[in-house]
């Protein structure tokens, strides 16, 4: 562990170059404003430790104010030692740090979801709470270029459509997330820590094949890299194309919605055809809006409508970034294609069940999405 906050000019040249590459990525690709306040999500692993070091080195140049949070998931016997490591790291880097406890097993048992999903949900919820407490503009995460490759495969197995299939966003203003290291190789981050004499914690659960992400990283990705040694570079190029396409579609859809806005309703009293489900909050895409759009644009509007009903506080007509892990917010491509086919053929009596307790149906050339609630 370093004894005092480091300075960029005092670290090895290779380490300094990496930091400047991250700075360039933050300024040119992420639009990070000078003077930003960032909350760092730190686990003590190599990625998040490198995140803390790099941003601390860049803080004077970018006029950053840094805070940190370590979430103790309580899933491993040495999780308390991980949190203690993060506190010591932040003390040496002169970064204020808090530790929050997460009852992952309790959420998993009460909600009927997996441990991995429960941990992710609680972690992001606690990060958002802490962000608000410390007044940070964004939460900085330690995802790196290798995580993009894993994420693309995860999304592929979930049936995620394009451009969300291209992987996680480097900046997500809806959830106030920032990923400064997303263009940086994982080994380069470890080399940085070694060059600066900083250790990190190893999480043994990262080697467990109990979790899908680990199975993909440990078993599937090595096979794909044998077939294509440049796989990570290829998937990063895919990620870049996805970001361009996403920006284009957001601009196009925002323009269309400015002319013919969607209609948000608070629900209806009558029961559905099933007679056991009442209408909850609804969103209608008007016929005049849909009639002038290409099917590709309509499909993206359907996805945006689903996200709005799942996340009404952030899902209006803003950026349509995908939410990895929030399966209920990811409408399956097959269902949306069937919905659009029914619209094109004028089949108005068909109802479509979507993830997250949502339903869609046609009404006079319009498409209505609604959240279903149990009938009284």
Spell out what each predicted region is.
Residues 2-222:
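Core alpha/beta nucleotide-donor-binding catalytic domains of modification enzymes
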Residues 2-47, 67, 102, 122, ...:
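AMP-forming adenylation/ATP pyrophosphatase catalytic core
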Residues 158, 162, 186, 225-229, ...:
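Alpha-helix boundary/capping and short turn/kink residues
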Residues 206-213, 234-243:
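Internal, active-site/partner-interface "lid" segment
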Residues 218-219, 223-235:
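Conserved anion/nucleotide-ligand pocket segment
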């Amino acid at each position: 562990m370093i004894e005092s906050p480091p300075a960029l000019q005092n670290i090895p040249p290779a380490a300094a170059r990496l930091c400047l590459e991250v700075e360039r990525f933050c300024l040119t690709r992420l639009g990070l404003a000078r003077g930003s306040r960032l909350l760092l999500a730190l686990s003590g692993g190599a990625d998040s430790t490198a995140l803390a070091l790099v941003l601390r080195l860049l803080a004077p140049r970018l006029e950053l104010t840094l805070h940190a949070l370590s979430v103790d998931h309580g899933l491993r016997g040495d999780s308390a030692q991980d949190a203690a490591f993060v506190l010591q790291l932040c003390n040496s880097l002169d970064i204020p740090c808090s530790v929050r406890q997460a009852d992952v097993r309790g959420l998993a048992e009460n909600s009927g979801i997996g441990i991995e999903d429960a941990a992710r949900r609680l972690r992001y919820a606690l990060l958002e709470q802490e962000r608000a407490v410390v007044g940070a503009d964004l939460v900085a995460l330690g995802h790196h270029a290798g995580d993009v490759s894993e994420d693309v495969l995860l999304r592929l197995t979930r049936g995620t459509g394009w451009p969300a299939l291209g992987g996680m966003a480097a900046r997500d203003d809806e959830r106030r997330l920032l990923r400064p290291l997303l263009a940086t190789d994982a080994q380069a981050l470890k080399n940085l820590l070694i060059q600066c004499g900083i250790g990190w914690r190893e999480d043994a659960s990262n080697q467990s094949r109990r979790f899908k992400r680990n199975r993909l990283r440990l078993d599937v990705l090595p096979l794909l890299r044998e077939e294509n040694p440049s796989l990570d570079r290829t998937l990063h190029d895919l990620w870049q194309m996805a970001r361009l396409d996403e920006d284009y579609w957001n601009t196009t859809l925002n323009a269309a919605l400015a002319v013919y806005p969607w209609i948000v309703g608070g629900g209806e009293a009558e029961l559905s055809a099933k007679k056991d489900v009442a209408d909850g909050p609804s969103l209608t895409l008007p016929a005049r809006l849909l009639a002038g759009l290409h099917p590709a644009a309509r499909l993206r509007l359907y996805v945006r409508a689903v996200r709005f009903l799942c996340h009404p506080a952030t899902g209006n007509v803003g950026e349509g970034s995908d939410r990895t892990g929030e399966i209920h917010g990811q409408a399956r491509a097959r269902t949306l294609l069937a919905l659009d086919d029914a619209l094109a053929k004028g089949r108005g009596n068909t109802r479509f069940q979507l993830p997250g307790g949502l339903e869609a149906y046609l009404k006079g050339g319009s498409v209505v999405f609604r959240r279903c609630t149990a009938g009284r």
